[in-house]
């Protein structure tokens, strides 16, 4: 990956041993930016990186991503054209065939329709090329860590799906390219929706979206929709019962339990808050950035829990926010821990994301354990 940016969000990552020789930076001067000369340096910079890797006995990548930020957004740079020019510069040489793709990391678009991680996912899957379809192959897209030990994989395997591919489990670039043979895609994160739409348009791979939610009734409805669309049978009664049992266990042990919820967690803070309230718990405060897609949750929260307060993490005045005076019994999310340092906390931000009934069950158990450990 070649960075043409401020690098403030990547310098720490690139210093980690596992990322050595995978991140490179192209220095630019102000005159280069003003005149546009920085764009002419990109093909040579890519070639220099590839030659460095070759000369040092490192693995030559199959693709190079050019990571750019707000500078070129303001300049209106056509990065697709820049990448095509960089690929053309490699044609005829020893590095011919290496793909070059843009990676838009515009902080300006973070609250827009296409935030950076939407672009990243779309760029990654744009590398897939047409391939003969396999009726027993499915892709699970949206996460960068694998779904492990979830009922979703079990349901698909019982339905005769032989290949359940995730980008995080692909050991080689060739294995990644085999994702193009999928009969359909399962989208588990809304930020991958644009990538799924692109794959449907380019490779004729349809998709179904299974949103990560914490309402067991909604989870059941999603699995029924998956079964109908995919033409498979799914019996989720046992898993649903286990999740409901974990909810009941927590409610019985801690009746009237009150939560504060942050957004630095494996959940949509507003959906999680609404689900907890419908389970019979209470939510005092939510620390999260409100986006249009969350209005439906806020509307229901206003009806079911009008006293719940919402604080925007992006609001500058949060600098003056004092330690929460909430009477909450437990918090979920690392940011909630910051605002409520003296209240038991469940970070719930592991790399391997929870999903479905397993996610509900594990979260209830984590909250139970945190309260028990705190002596509540």
Q: Where does each model-flagged region fall?
A:
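An N-terminal assembly and electron-transfer interface module characteristic of large anaerobic redox
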Residues: 1-376
């Amino acid at each position: 990956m070649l960075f043409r940016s401020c690098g403030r969000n990547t310098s720490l990552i690139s210093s980690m041993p596992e990322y050595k020789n995978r991140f490179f930076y192209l220095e630019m001067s102000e005159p280069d930016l003003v005149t546009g000369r920085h764009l002419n340096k990109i093909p040579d910079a890519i070639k220099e990186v590839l030659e460095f890797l070759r000369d040092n006995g490192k693995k030559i990548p199959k693709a190079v991503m050019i990571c750019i930020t707000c500078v070129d957004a303001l300049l209106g740079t056509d990065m697709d054209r820049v990448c095509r020019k960089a690929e053309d510069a490699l044609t005829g040489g020893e590095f011919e065939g290496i793909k070059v793709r843009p990676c838009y990391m515009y902080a300006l678009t973070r609250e827009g329709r296409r935030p950076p991680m939407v672009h990243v996912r779309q760029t990654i899957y744009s590398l897939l090329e047409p391939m003969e379809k396999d009726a027993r192959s499915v892709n699970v897209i949206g996460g960068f860590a694998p779904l492990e030990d979830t009922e979703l994989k079990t349901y698909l395997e019982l339905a005769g799906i032989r290949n359940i591919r995730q980008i995080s489990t692909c050991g080689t670039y060739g294995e990644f390219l085999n994702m193009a043979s999928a009969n359909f895609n399962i989208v588990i994160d809304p930020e991958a929706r644009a990538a799924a739409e692109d794959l449907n348009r380019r490779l004729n791979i349809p998709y179904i979206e299974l949103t990560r939610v914490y309402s067991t009734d909604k989870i059941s409805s999603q699995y029924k929709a998956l079964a109908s669309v995919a033409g498979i049978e799914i019996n989720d009664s046992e898993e649903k019962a286990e999740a409901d049992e974990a909810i009941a266990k927590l409610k019985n042990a801690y009746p009237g339990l009150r939560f504060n919820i942050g957004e630095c967690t494996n959940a949509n803070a507003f959906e999680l808050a609404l689900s907890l309230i419908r389970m019979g718990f209470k939510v005092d405060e939510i620390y999260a950035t409100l986006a249009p897609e969350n209005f439906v949750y806020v509307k229901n929260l206003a009806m079911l829990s009008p006293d719940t307060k919402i604080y925007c993490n992006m609001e500058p005045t949060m600098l003056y926010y004092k330690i929460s005076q909430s009477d909450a019994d437990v918090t979920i999310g690392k940011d909630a821990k910051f605002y409520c340092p003296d209240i038991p906390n469940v970070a719930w931000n592991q790399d391997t994301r929870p999903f479905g009934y397993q996610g509900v069950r594990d979260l209830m158990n984590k909250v139970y354990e945190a309260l028990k450990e705190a002596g509540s």
